[in-house]
Swiss-Prot record:
<feature type="modified residue" description="Phosphoserine">
    <location>
        <position position="41"/>
    </location>
</feature>
<feature type="modified residue" description="Phosphoserine">
    <location>
        <position position="103"/>
    </location>
</feature>
<keyword id="KW-0496">Mitochondrion</keyword>
<dbReference type="GO" id="GO:0000266">
    <property type="term" value="P:mitochondrial fission"/>
</dbReference>
<feature type="modified residue" description="Phosphoserine">
    <location>
        <position position="238"/>
    </location>
</feature>
<keyword id="KW-0472">Membrane</keyword>
<feature type="modified residue" description="Phosphothreonine">
    <location>
        <position position="30"/>
    </location>
</feature>
<dbReference type="Pfam" id="PF05308">
    <property type="entry name" value="Mito_fiss_reg"/>
</dbReference>
<feature type="modified residue" description="Phosphoserine">
    <location>
        <position position="225"/>
    </location>
</feature>
<feature type="modified residue" description="Phosphoserine">
    <location>
        <position position="224"/>
    </location>
</feature>
<comment type="similarity">
    <text>Belongs to the MTFR1 family.</text>
</comment>
<protein>
    <recommendedName>
        <fullName>Mitochondrial fission regulator 1-like</fullName>
    </recommendedName>
</protein>
<keyword id="KW-0597">Phosphoprotein</keyword>
<feature type="modified residue" description="Phosphoserine">
    <location>
        <position position="110"/>
    </location>
</feature>
<comment type="function">
    <text>Mitochondrial protein required for adaptation of miochondrial dynamics to metabolic changes. Regulates mitochondrial morphology at steady state and mediates AMPK-dependent stress-induced mitochondrial fragmentation via the control of OPA1 levels.</text>
</comment>
<feature type="modified residue" description="Phosphoserine">
    <location>
        <position position="261"/>
    </location>
</feature>
<dbReference type="GO" id="GO:0005741">
    <property type="term" value="C:mitochondrial outer membrane"/>
</dbReference>
């Protein structure tokens, strides 16, 4: 009886349809296979040891980020938990990060390299400080020299002024300064003018050489000679001033010409143009010789 019942038992959706009396359950059963799906099974790889499986977590965590960044190979085509090295054997190094070929860029390493390039070295800093100290020392020396020249130039017209009360003291100074200024050679002034300038004797020597000048009968002659000497001194002082001005102009012109020549020699553009000009000139000469 039970066997007959088991054989008679038929699923509802396998019965033949009977017109409009067919239920929705029968329609779903005929269209969908109502059978359980196979369970998912995981296969263990034979090459992985038990120690590696214990040490590595099955799910990647935030601790894997450093390993992913320091890995040499691409990591998008494999399972990270299978190829991650052991914690006690893995030691990241900057060389691995620089030589890796990963899709994720290492921004931290590039920033560190840029900072290292921007920081100047200690020897360069010490050298620049030494150069600055040397330049300041040279500037102070130049300032002292210029100040001494200015002081000497300001003292010379006072001694050479014709209205000075003491005539005997500035005359020897005038003789020495006059000789030094007239000995300078300028392109605008010829040597004949220097030769034609007579040497003026000092007034004390004239008075000592002629003792009769102190007598009352020679006072008029002495006064006239002193006036002539004052006029000649004023002319000589103006001539000395003009010589000093011309001397300064000549020095400035020489320094400007020297600076221009040095700038032209040191300018890289001038050197390159000169080399190119010579090169093309040689090429043109060779072409002309071949044509002839």
């Amino acid at each position: 009886m039970s066997e007959m019942e088991a054989s008679v038992t038929i699923p509802i959706w396998q019965n033949k349809p009977h017109g409009a009396a067919r239920s929705v359950v029968r329609r779903i059963g005929t269209n969908l296979p109502l059978k359980p799906c196979a369970r998912a099974s995981f296969e263990t790889l034979p090459n992985i040891s038990d120690l590696c499986l214990r040490d590595v977590p099955p799910v990647p965590t935030l601790a894997d980020i450093a390993w992913i960044a320091a890995d040499e190979e691409e990591t998008y085509a494999r399972v990270r938990s299978d190829t991650r090295p052991l914690r006690h054997t893995w030691k990241p190094s900057p060389l691995i990060v620089m030589q890796r070929n990963a899709s994720v860029p290492n921004l931290r390493g590039s920033e560190e390299r840029l900072l290292a390039l921007k920081k100047p070295a200690l020897p360069a800093l010490s050298r620049t400080t030494e150069l600055q100290d040397e330049l300041s020392h040279l500037r102070s020396q130049i300032a002292k020299i210029v100040a001494a020249d200015a002081a000497s130039a300001s003292l010379t017209p006072d001694f050479l002024s014709p209205g000075s009360s003491n005539v005997s003291s500035p005359l020897p100074c005038f003789g020495s300064s006059f000789h030094s200024t007239t000995s300078f050679v300028i392109s605008d002034i010829t040597e004949e003018t220097e030769v034609e300038v007579p040497e003026l004797p000092s007034v004390p020597l004239l008075c000592s050489a002629s003792p009769e000048c102190c007598k009352p009968e020679h006072k008029a002659a002495c006064s006239s000679s002193e006036e002539d000497d004052c006029v000649s001194l004023s002319k000589a002082s103006s001539f000395a001033d003009m010589m000093g001005i011309l001397k300064d102009f000549h020095r400035m012109k020489q320094s400007q010409d020297l600076n221009r020549s040095l700038l032209k020699e040191e300018d890289p553009a001038v050197l390159i143009s000169e080399v190119l000009r010579r090169k093309f000139a040689l090429k043109e000469e060779d072409i002309s010789r071949k044509g002839n």
